């Protein structure tokens, strides 16, 4: 207050005012500050005093031929004075107005194409709806967000190559456009920008916006997809928020969302297969999202989500070094620990072997709807500060932290046996057992934890075992805060290893992620996800399994046919028949299988009973482990459309309908493909396959005795010759091969040779 009085006093003296307004600044430090370097030190001030001058703009001399000296009001538009230090002329801001109103109009066709991201933003805002403004405390946490809607996902280097190729195609320099997306974009942009007059530099800047993901670490309280971030300044302040619904979607958000759904589906499916890692890789490589290969998206897309990270790790890509537990991302901010196995007893006297973290550590925990700071020592929670959207989210965070602390009172709070299993029916590890148990019901845990009186600290309150807030008492070590905990900002990625069961470890051997951490949330993908792998057939329900299984047999009929006769066991074990088994009633699966296998054996033995359509139809039923029984079936039941439908062993049905004339197969009314083979190839194919390992020498030769049946051939010694009865009663002379190595070619050549021998 004193200072202000003093200043007022000084200002009232005319001499003070004069000194401040008239004296030159001659203090060297000040002159240095404002004159060194090219960087403008006070842009706003500079702009103000520049615009107060009459001619603050410089322009190329040619402008004097294109703009009159005075406008309609008689105001001067440019000065005859040259700009000091360049051969440009000084121009008034009024000249800009004149040019905008009366200047030449160029072709504007390229503008929407170049400034695409801006035009699209205007459209989104035009069609978006802004709702009411609410005043409330905003729990914002800094997250890494995408600030640039509508971009492709190229790396900076890839984008640079595309931009150079589009904007400066004749410049020298090695540019290698390899990825599919690079080539597509380059072609598209070159066509769009033919005869474009906009300055190349501007075009390059705008292309960069379109091709590269730009992220910033910003405080966010609501949606984090880029169409929300672009209006962040309109939707949330320090104490207010405004409801907003975007007026359009952008592909990059859709890719992120669909990638997460595809990754979750794939990890869940892989976890229950015999070799999870191999299955996961097979599925990632055969899946497309919005027409782009999933593996390409994984390489470029920085989305961090548990399932996505598991897929990335499997492909050998680096991922974030933070670890996941109970759906929260943990990042150690200080301290260290060593791990040691320890046996503990639950409240139900069940023994658990847990890996105890010995030592003092601090973590940040970030979830979708709650965040926390956790300080812990060996098997002891020291402090937990939680903030969250609602009571439910806060409770989730507290449970995860209490389990993670490995405190004895948590383990003693277990009631009943722990026997949770994952999707593959394997027991979960002890930490996840405990987590699942308390996620189901945490009452005993909270009651047993204990409470303590609390000090009044700004911005913090206590929370009682029944989840009600309090300013006097709180559960031991637990406090609720108004402020959120920021997400880990670093984009550092580390090399990790992944085992067969999809557990991911860092180089010190700490588990960062496992399939148990993958969310069970189901969603509908925005872009079409095409899973080509048979493992994913069941994702669209039983009908899709049925159609896909038969489509697969028809597409691969040539190889299936040979295996059917040569090595049926290998064929029955093919993974493509796995999903089909879930459609066959469990009680009868084995009998169906035994029945079909016997039927197939008869077809192999008795020539002429081979029936392509019937083999295709019954083949999936033979894949189950067979039970021997005398039962005969005229039809099989499959569980589709909510009830059992029947497939006839002989003949067509609505489930399986093969049209002999057109060779088209329809399954449940859906087209399942066309069989491509010659009518006589049907039997010849099988016989040629059966004759693998035999060389067909020509027509029957009586010197080698009476014709044998195909089954009797197996008794021949290597190099021995014999006549053999094939097909429609024809006899040919064969010799058993001396070497096995050439067997593969036999089945292809046999068909031709049989024909030559007979004719």
UniProtKB/Swiss-Prot annotation:
Domain of life: Viruses
Site (Mammalian adaptation): 627
Places the protein is found: Virion; Host nucleus; Host mitochondrion
Keyword flag Secreted: no
Locus of motif Nuclear localization signal: 736-739
One annotated GO molecular function: RNA-directed RNA polymerase activity
Record bears the keyword Protein transport: no
Keywords: Cap snatching, Eukaryotic host gene expression shutoff by virus, Eukaryotic host transcription shutoff by virus, Host gene expression shutoff by virus, Host mitochondrion, Host nucleus, Host-virus interaction, Inhibition of host innate immune response by virus, Inhibition of host MAVS by virus, Inhibition of host RLR pathway by virus, Inhibition of host RNA polymerase II by virus, mRNA capping, mRNA processing, Viral immunoevasion, Viral transcription, Virion
GO CC, alphabetical: extracellular region; host cell mitochondrion; host cell nucleus; virion component
Pfam families: Flu_PB2_1st (PF20947), Flu_PB2_2nd (PF20948), Flu_PB2_3rd (PF20949), Flu_PB2_4th (PF20950), Flu_PB2_5th (PF00604), Flu_PB2_6th (PF20951), Flu_PB2_7th (PF20952)
A biological-process GO annotation: viral RNA genome replication
Function comment: Plays an essential role in transcription initiation and cap-stealing mechanism, in which cellular capped pre-mRNAs are used to generate primers for viral transcription. Recognizes and binds the 7-methylguanosine-containing cap of the target pre-RNA which is subsequently cleaved after 10-13 nucleotides by the viral protein PA. Plays a role in the initiation of the viral genome replication and modulates the activity of the ribonucleoprotein (RNP) complex.
HAMAP family assigned: INV_PB2
Subunit structure and binding partners: Influenza RNA polymerase is composed of three subunits: PB1, PB2 and PA. Interacts (via N-terminus) with PB1 (via C-terminus). Interacts with nucleoprotein NP (via N-terminus). Interacts (via N-terminus) with host MAVS (via N-terminus); this interaction inhibits host innate immune response.
Annotated family: Belongs to the influenza viruses PB2 family.
Protein's name according to its UniProt entry: Polymerase basic protein 2
Organism of this sequence: Influenza A virus (strain A/Puerto Rico/8/1934 H1N1)
Recorded name of the encoding gene: PB2
């Amino acid at each position: 207050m004193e200072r202000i009085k003093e200043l007022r006093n000084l200002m009232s003296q005319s001499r003070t005012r004069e000194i401040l307004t008239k004296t030159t600044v001659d203090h060297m430090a000040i002159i240095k500050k404002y004159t060194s370097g090219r960087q403008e030190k006070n842009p706003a001030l500079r702009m103000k005093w520049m615009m107060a001058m009459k001619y603050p703009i410089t322009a190329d001399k040619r402008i004097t031929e294109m703009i009159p000296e005075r406008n309609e009001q008689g105001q001067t538009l440019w000065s005859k004075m040259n700009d000091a230090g360049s051969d440009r002329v000084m121009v008034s801001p009024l000249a800009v107005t004149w040019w905008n109103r009366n200047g030449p109009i160029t072709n504007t066709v390229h503008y929407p194409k170049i400034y695409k991201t801006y035009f699209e933003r205007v459209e989104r805002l035009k069609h978006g709806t802004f709702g009411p403004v609410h005043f409330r405390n905003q729990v914002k946490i800094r997250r890494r967000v995408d600030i640039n809607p509508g971009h492709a996902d190229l790396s900076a280097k890839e984008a640079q190559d595309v931009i150079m190729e589009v904007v400066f195609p004749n410049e020298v320099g090695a540019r290698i456009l390899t990825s599919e997306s690079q080539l597509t974009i380059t072609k598209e942009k070159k066509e769009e920008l033919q005869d474009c007059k906009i300055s190349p530099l501007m075009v390059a800047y705008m292309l960069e916006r379109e091709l590269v993901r730009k992220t910033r670490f910003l405080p966010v309280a609501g949606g984090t997809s880029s169409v929300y971030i672009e209006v962040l300044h309109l939707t949330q302040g320090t104490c207010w928020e405004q409801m907003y619904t975007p007026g359009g979607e952008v592909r990059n958000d859709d890719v992120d969302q669909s990638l997460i759904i595809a990754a979750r589906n794939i990890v869940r499916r892989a976890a229950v297969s015999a070799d999870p890692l191999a299955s996961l890789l097979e599925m990632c490589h055969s899946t497309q999202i919005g027409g782009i290969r999933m593996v390409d998206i994984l390489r470029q897309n920085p989305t961090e989500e548990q399932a996505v990270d598991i897929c990335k790790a499997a492909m050998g890509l680096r991922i974030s070094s933070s670890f996941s537990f109970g759906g929260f991302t943990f990042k150690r901010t200080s301290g260290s620990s060593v791990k040691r196995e320890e046996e503990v007893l639950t409240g139900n006297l069940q023994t658990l072997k847990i890996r105890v973290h010995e030592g003092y550590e601090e973590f940040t925990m970030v979830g979708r709807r709650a965040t926390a700071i956790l300080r812990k020592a060996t098997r002891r929670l020291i402090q937990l500060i939680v903030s969250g959207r609602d009571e439910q989210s806060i409770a989730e965070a507290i449970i995860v932290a209490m389990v993670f602390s490995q405190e004895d009172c948590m383990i003693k709070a277990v009631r009943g046996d722990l026997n949770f299993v994952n999707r593959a029916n394997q027991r979960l590890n002890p930490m996840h057992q405990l987590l699942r148990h308390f996620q189901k019901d945490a009452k005993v845990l909270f009651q047993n934890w204990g409470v303590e009186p609390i000090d009044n600290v700004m911005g913090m309150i206590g929370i009682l075992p029944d989840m009600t807030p309090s300013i006097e008492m709180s559960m031991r070590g637990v406090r609720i805060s108004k402020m959120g905990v920021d997400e880990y900002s670093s984009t550092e990625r580390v090399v990790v290893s992944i085992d067969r069961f999809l557990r991911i470890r860092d180089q010190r051997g700490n588990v960062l992620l496992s399939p148990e951490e993958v969310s069970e949330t189901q969603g509908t993908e925005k872009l079409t996800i095409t899973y080509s792998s048979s493992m994913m057939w069941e994702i669209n329900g039983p009908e899709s399994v049925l159609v896909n299984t038969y489509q697969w047999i028809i597409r691969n009929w040539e190889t299936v046919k040979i295996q059917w006769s040569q090595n049926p066991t290998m064929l029955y074990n093919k993974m493509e028949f796995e999903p089909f088994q879930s459609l066959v009633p469990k009680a009868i699966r084995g009998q169906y299988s035994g029945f079909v296998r016997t039927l197939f054996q008869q077809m192999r033995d008795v020539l002429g009973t081979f029936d392509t359509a019937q083999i295709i139809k019954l083949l999936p039923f033979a894949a189950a482990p067979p039970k021997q029984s005398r039962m005969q079936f005229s039809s099989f039941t499959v569980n589709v459309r909510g009830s059992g439908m029947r497939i006839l062993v002989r003949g067509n049905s609505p489930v399986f309908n093969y049209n002999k004339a057109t060779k088209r197969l329809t399954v449940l009314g859906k087209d399942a493909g066309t069989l491509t083979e010659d009518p006589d190839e049907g039997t010849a194919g099988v016989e040629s396959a059966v004759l693998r390992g035999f060389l067909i020498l020509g027509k029957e030769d009586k010197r080698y005795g009476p014709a044998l049946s195909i089954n009797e051939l197996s008794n021949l010694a290597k190099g021995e010759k014999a006549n053999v009865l094939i097909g429609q009663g024809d006899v040919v002379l064969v010799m058993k091969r001396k070497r096995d190595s050439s067997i593969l070619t036999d089945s292809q050549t046999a068909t031709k040779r049989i024909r030559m021998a007979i004719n």
